[in-house]
Amino acid sequence: MTPSFATCDLCDAHKNDVSGAFRVLPPVFRDFGGVRQFCGPVVTVKCFEDNSSVKAAVESVGYQETPAGRVGKVLVVDGGGSLRRALLGGNLGAAAARNGWAGVVIDGCVRDVSELAAVGLGIRALASMPLPTEKRGEGQSDLALQIQGVWVRPGDWLYADEDGMVLAAGRLV
């Protein structure tokens, strides 16, 4: 279950943070998933026009057990901002939901938009693009990324709602 939060309230509470522990992603991402509000610890993938590592991630367990219960993770994908190929489609979106992921954020494109809207998963990306990726088996995971100029690290917490997305070095709610 997603805890109750509002990104505006989180920004109000952390507006004077100059340490870099609290960050705000720019408002360039569109909402494609069936879930509008989501949060969780971040897992990272870096790939360019090859979604092999995205597929491997969403086909793995997308949650962690905590004393408070099961917490879905958020996959953050650095697709280099490419608008030429889709890194996530209906099949992979369904796999992510089935495996317990809370959300997927892609600095790149998605496809199968109507299928993604029906999936119980938060999905943010730059745009839709019907072309699939090449399958070269390339990509890296579990590394610090710069997404639209903002640092995102494995283990950060990402909070997303209708107002935007914020990151924190640890869990806030």
From Swiss-Prot:
<dbReference type="InterPro" id="IPR010203">
    <property type="entry name" value="RraA"/>
</dbReference>
<dbReference type="GO" id="GO:0008948">
    <property type="term" value="F:oxaloacetate decarboxylase activity"/>
</dbReference>
<dbReference type="GO" id="GO:0008428">
    <property type="term" value="F:ribonuclease inhibitor activity"/>
</dbReference>
<dbReference type="InterPro" id="IPR005493">
    <property type="entry name" value="RraA/RraA-like"/>
</dbReference>
<keyword id="KW-0479">Metal-binding</keyword>
<feature type="binding site">
    <location>
        <position position="111"/>
    </location>
    <ligand>
        <name>substrate</name>
    </ligand>
</feature>
<comment type="subunit">
    <text>Homotrimer.</text>
</comment>
<dbReference type="InterPro" id="IPR036704">
    <property type="entry name" value="RraA/RraA-like_sf"/>
</dbReference>
<dbReference type="GO" id="GO:0046872">
    <property type="term" value="F:metal ion binding"/>
</dbReference>
<dbReference type="GO" id="GO:0051252">
    <property type="term" value="P:regulation of RNA metabolic process"/>
</dbReference>
<comment type="similarity">
    <text>Belongs to the class II aldolase/RraA-like family.</text>
</comment>
<dbReference type="GO" id="GO:0047443">
    <property type="term" value="F:4-hydroxy-4-methyl-2-oxoglutarate aldolase activity"/>
</dbReference>
<feature type="binding site">
    <location>
        <begin position="89"/>
        <end position="92"/>
    </location>
    <ligand>
        <name>substrate</name>
    </ligand>
</feature>
<protein>
    <recommendedName>
        <fullName>Putative 4-hydroxy-4-methyl-2-oxoglutarate aldolase</fullName>
        <ecNumber>4.1.3.17</ecNumber>
        <ecNumber>4.1.1.112</ecNumber>
    </recommendedName>
</protein>
<keyword id="KW-0456">Lyase</keyword>
<comment type="function">
    <text>Catalyzes the aldol cleavage of 4-hydroxy-4-methyl-2-oxoglutarate (HMG) into 2 molecules of pyruvate. Also contains a secondary oxaloacetate (OAA) decarboxylase activity due to the common pyruvate enolate transition state formed following C-C bond cleavage in the retro-aldol and decarboxylation reactions.</text>
</comment>
<feature type="binding site">
    <location>
        <position position="112"/>
    </location>
    <ligand>
        <name>a divalent metal cation</name>
    </ligand>
</feature>
<dbReference type="Pfam" id="PF03737">
    <property type="entry name" value="RraA-like"/>
</dbReference>
